[in-house]
Amino acid sequence: MIVGYVGRLAAEKRVDLLASLAHLPGVRLAVTGGGPMEEDLRAVLPTASFLGMRHGEDLARIYASLDIFVHTGPFETFGQTVQEAAASGLPVVAPAAGGPLDLVADGVTGYLVPPGDPGALTAAVSRLAADPALRAQFSQAARRRVLGRTWSALTDELLDHYEAVIDDATPVARLAA
């Protein structure tokens, strides 16, 4: 069972929380990315495989080799790696904060856990690791959920939000003039 993380290796990403998973039987950790905390994380996660920074086909192959994707950072505004993992058909365990709230349907495509809670993170990964049928169910649901989230669709959605704000603000601006 390969549990993976992809992202910047920086303190605010809380990759150190992966240490709570190292003792799970049959679980191997794969950490993809680089950053200022890499050396410290190698000490905290001595059994993890550190794969370095990857892009394109290399990154796609890494996602394809994972069984579960874990995102640990509580401050993501978008969560590109969460979306990439879901598009790769991976169940995702992520903090119930920021971007993952829009990308992970708790109990459907993965699990949302309290930010910074290693016990909840471990429990969620354990549940998925122990149940291949649940992983397969979440995998299919995750992929379906992000199929329509192309850059074009996201840009259109963002433009719609801007237009709504402008439309709402215009009457107020006219009154103030």
Task: List each model region and its residues.
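Nucleotide-activated donor-binding/catalytic signature segment of Leloir-type glycosyltransferases, i.e.
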Residues: 39-57
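A conserved mid-protein helix/loop that constitutes part of the nucleotide-sugar donor-binding site
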Residues: 1-24, 36-40, 119
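Short hydrophobic beta-strand element within catalytic cores of glycosyltransferases
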Residues: 91-94
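Short alpha-helical segment that forms part of, or immediately flanks, the ligand-binding pocket
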Residues: 60, 78, 83-87, 101-102, ...
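Conserved acidic donor-binding segment of nucleotide-sugar-dependent glycosyltransferases
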Residues: 106-107, 111-118, 127-132, 147
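C-terminal alpha-helical cap of glycosyltransferases
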Residues: 151-177
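Short alpha-helical donor nucleotide-sugar binding micro-motif in glycosyltransferases
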Residues: 54, 61-66, 158
